[in-house]
Structures are given as C-alpha cells and as structure tokens.
Amino acid sequence: MAANDTISDMLTRIRNSCMAQHTTTKVPATKMTRSIAKVLKDEGFIGEFEQEGEGIKKYLVIFLKYKGKNRQPIIRYLKRVSKPGLRVYKNRKELPRVLGGIGIAIISTSSGIMTDREARKRGIGGEVLCYVW
C-alpha cells in the first residue's frame, strides 16, 4: 500500500514494532526517512539502520532498542506534529523543548533534518516534524 505521508508511515511502523517488541522494522526508503533515522540513531533511540532492495522497492531496516529484562522500548512516545494538512513552522525563538530537554523534536530546516537542540544552537528554525522521548 502506498503511503502519501511517508514520515507518519515511518513513525507508525516504529511505534507499532516497539509495542510488539519486534527487533526490526522495515520502512520505505526516502531521503527524508533516511535523515530521520540518522537523527534517531545519533540520539540513541534506535540501533543501526541499513538500506535494502533495489530500484523503487528500497527499504530501510531499522533495528530497535530495548532496555532491561522486561525489554522496555527506548522510544516511549513518538508523535507527528506537522502534517500534510496542517504544517507547523517555528522560528529559532519558538522552537519547543520536549519534556524539558529529555525528549527531542525533529526539525526540518534549510540546513537539513536535525534536533531542536542543534537547530537552537545554530540559530535557525524550521518545520517541526515530530516529538520523540
């Protein structure tokens, strides 16, 4: 099934896989999903990710992380903020702090996809894609 909003599709697949305690999940590979996966990996929310397939059928295989004996998912909350029907833009002064700095907001800026902390440090704003903690 083709998804019009690849970011929401990616976040939903990760959220569902975490709740089912799967070790991996597959998401369609686009520049945007690769960038978001890189930010999640750099922030320690997911393990590795690798690209699989050729041509149109490219997928990212994302390795999920858990903690403790009960395998609690590292990602406890994953929410899409800016949607195709209602885009949410914030300037550098309005960038949100998620849970007082414990979580992250993933921002799409003119300099690429980054966390809210990095965007604040560079002094740039952009589209708030999602919140993660």
From Swiss-Prot:
It comes from the Bacteria. One of its GO terms (molecular function) is rRNA binding. It holds the Pfam family Ribosomal_S8. GO terms for cellular component: ribonucleoprotein complex; ribosome. PROSITE patterns: RIBOSOMAL_S8. One of its GO terms (biological process) is translation. Keywords: Ribonucleoprotein, Ribosomal protein, RNA-binding, rRNA-binding. Belongs to the universal ribosomal protein uS8 family. One of the primary rRNA binding proteins, it binds directly to 16S rRNA central domain where it helps coordinate assembly of the platform of the 30S subunit. Part of the 30S ribosomal subunit. Contacts proteins S5 and S12. This is Small ribosomal subunit protein uS8. It comes from Trichodesmium erythraeum (strain IMS101). The lineage of its organism: Bacteria, Bacillati, Cyanobacteriota, Cyanophyceae, Oscillatoriophycideae.
